[in-house]
Regions:
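Small beta-barrel nucleic-acid-binding modules, primarily SNase/OB-fold domains
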Residues: 1-131
């Protein structure tokens, strides 16, 4: 793993962009014309740091679902370290919301349940929000 781009995307050493399946984190930048500008949404920086803590200096493994690439050319994957699935950990910690986009639904039920528990416990981005 080379670089954490944001809370749900990493760039490998060969330049391949990996977008985590089943999660959505707050953005840290947005496009203005042809430029990317820093514009963190609430909890965007925290989600990026949580992702960094989960994958930095770790060997990762990728699990694919039905669709392997998104419309931007990024590889879609469930990302694993020796500690488990990063996608699930981000939701469990409250730094990501579950986001199901068929046909990539292999772990959707589990991710939704983790999201429900994080929301009820008001962890991370769910803090101070209505249950």
């Amino acid at each position: 793993m080379a670089q954490v781009v944001d809370g749900d995307t990493i760039r490998l050493t060969d330049g391949t962009m990996i977008r985590y399946i089943g999660v959505d984190t707050p953005e840290v930048r947005r496009r203005e014309g042809t430029q990317w500008v820093s514009a963190p949404e609430p909890y965007g920086l925290e989600a990026t740091e949580a992702n960094r803590m989960l994958v930095a200096d770790r060997t990762i493994r990728l699990e694919y679902d039905v669709e392997t690439h998104d419309r931007y050319g990024r590889v879609l994957a469930y990302v694993y370290t020796d500690d488990g699935m990063v996608n699930a950990a981000l939701i469990e910690q409250g730094y990501a919301a579950p986001m199901t986009i068929p046909p990539n639904v292999r772990h959707a039920d589990m991710l939704r349940e983790l999201g429900r528990a994080a929301r009820e416990a008001q962890r991370g981005l769910w803090k101070d929000r209505e249950r």
